[in-house]
Amino acid sequence: MPVTMETSKEHSKKRKRKHGGSGNAALTSANAAKSLVKTTLSSKGEASAEKQEMKKRKTEHPSLMEDRVSENVVDEPEEVVEEDSEASQPPVEQDDEQKSESEQQPELPSLNALSLPQTENEPQKFTELNLSEKTLKAIQEMGFETMTEIQRRGIPPLMAGRDVLGAAKTGSGKTLSFLIPAVEMLSALRFKPRNGTGVIVVSPTRELALQIFGVARELMAHHSQTYGIVIGGANRRAEAEKLTKGVNLLIATPGRLLDHLQNTDGFVFKNLKALVIDEADRILEVGFEDEMRQIVKILPSEDRQTMLFSATQTTKVEDLARISLRPGPLYINVDHRKEHSTVEGLEQGYVICDSDKRFLLLFSFLKRNLKKKIIVFFSSCNCVKYHAELLNYIDLPVLDLHGKQKQQKRTNTFFEFCNAKQGTLICTDVAARGLDIPAVDWIIQFDPPDDPRDYIHRVGRTARGANGKGRSLMFLQPSEVGFLKHLKDARVPVVEFEFPAKKIVNVQSQLEKLIGQNYYLNKSAKDGYRSYLQAYASHSLRSVFDVNKLDLVKVAKGFGFPTPPRVDISLGASMSRDKKQTSRRNYGSQPRHAPKFKRKTSDD
């Protein structure tokens, strides 16, 4: 039977007839697949015109939800409704006999029936993967030619439909290794907005989700499939509207994803073909274990491919892999044979410095490196807030990023620093995972990381890519040198850097005078001082980072106080490591409302 093009009027009549039917059934899987191919062929001309139009409209700055989602579905929003609606099926031609056959058949070809190109030998370049022309063109426009090890070993089995548990150090190219197979699968199955979501990527932080979204935007520049992002802090109603219209590739943070799965009626995810869990160890560390279990339980498991990536393999990651992956997954570890746990182009050092000299050294270092791109890590939001206010006040401009900021502020700061050629970003560990910030020269760990894994992820913000170069510097107090043994056990090579005393600018007296006279800086300094002690008291390596060994007079001088201010640190001292994790604080942020502790009395 020849394939004919439908006019919009004819298609509208068929659509009305389909919506007006009373319980008409779907096609069998064979007929559905056959009809889908016919429909795709018949609409080839229309799709081509749409793609040209979308190409013209492509914007440079990624928004929280790409405009393309609404452009692709503007003429057919009524076809994607609730999850069990008939209207979410592909628009295939049906006669009355076929309609009455079955109501439980899939609407898209299964992955088992799909034959994606495979390569027998391990490829070296993207052109050897037999990817679609659209994907190859996008990769070339992104400037990539040769694959990294995780891409060489991960992409072929993923394109063949295998479940994969991948372990690779930060900066190894994991994002493309799971996005390329996902995009190719959506393209091969000819996903359309009315089919709903075919791939979900779960990310631990909003910034990492935005970054993955940006890569997906570039990779799908020549594809007609839709993509979007749902994250905490964004407009939930706007997200729900876009999901109802149809988002084929969805990037999400766990809490917001679970919210939409449970409460957004028009969110069609029954056609899900692939689930990607990125930075799984961090997702579980910050208290999303229950959410991830619920997400995996809600999502359809039959005919679903799962890709789980984690820089470190923990017991919790193994448990998540057990419930989410199909039996017999492929395990890829590209780091186990490496001599060091950090990338080769990274020069790593530490400096031993007393508490009262730490800020002076940081100030001197930043002053001497104004032309460099630097990230400075702190242990708490209040420490970031205080140092940002102080440095900007004394004309040393910095950007700040932490979990207490509103999402729009965080997003703007992230992209501003990404686009900057030089400058300083001071932040909590919210920026320590997965973020690909271009051309970072120095990573400064002003406050100590919680463990060697956090150290590795912090320094992973520099020396990224195959031939990336960068430097890192960690501040240690004399009582903290025991941390070096933990780094050595984790295969992290560090050497001691020395800074001559004559090169350190002594601004201590001016600092104390400023903090004493400026009410707002004084209050901010006191909050930072308190939060620093709280974070130190709740450190996981208490044998090394013992709050009782701190010289509080010297610590106070580092915050601009001649004598230690009176602060209550009972919250930090009483907060166990497990409680800190399960509270889901945003990488250093303090709870909005501190718990009330019952005062002990003699009657107790």
UniProtKB/Swiss-Prot annotation:
Any one GO CC term of the record: nucleolus
GO molecular-function terms, A-Z: ATP binding; ATP hydrolysis activity; RNA binding; RNA helicase activity
Region described as Disordered: spans on this chain: 1-126, 570-604
Motif (Q motif): 124-152
Example GO BP: rRNA processing
Basic and acidic residues bias (residue ranges): 60-70
Domain Helicase C-terminal: 345-515
DEAD box, short sequence motif: residues: 278-281
Domain named Helicase ATP-binding: residues: 155-331
EC number(s) from the headed UniProt entry: 3.6.4.13
Binding site for ATP: 168-175
Record field: compositional bias (Acidic residues): 73-86
Cellular compartments annotated: Nucleus, Nucleolus
Biased composition (Basic residues): 11-20, 593-604
InterPro entries linked to this entry: DDX18/Has1_DEADc, DEAD/DEAH_box_helicase_dom, Helicase_ATP-bd, Helicase_C-like, P-loop_NTPase, RNA-helicase_DEAD-box_CS, RNA_helicase_DEAD_Q_motif, SPB4-like_CTE
Polar residues composition-biased segments: 25-45, 112-121
The UniProt record lists the keyword ATP-binding: yes
Keywords: ATP-binding, Helicase, Hydrolase, Nucleotide-binding, Nucleus, Ribosome biogenesis, RNA-binding, rRNA processing
Subunit structure of this chain's protein: Associates in the nucleolus with the 60S and pre-60S ribosomal subunits.
Function: ATP-dependent RNA helicase involved in 40S ribosomal subunit biogenesis. Required for the processing and cleavage of 35S pre-rRNA at sites A0, A1, and A2, leading to mature 18S rRNA.
Domain notes: The Q motif is unique to and characteristic of the DEAD box family of RNA helicases and controls ATP binding and hydrolysis.
Family the entry assigns: Belongs to the DEAD box helicase family. DDX18/HAS1 subfamily.
Protein name as annotated: ATP-dependent RNA helicase HAS1
Lineage: Eukaryota, Fungi, Dikarya, Ascomycota, Pezizomycotina
Gene: HAS1
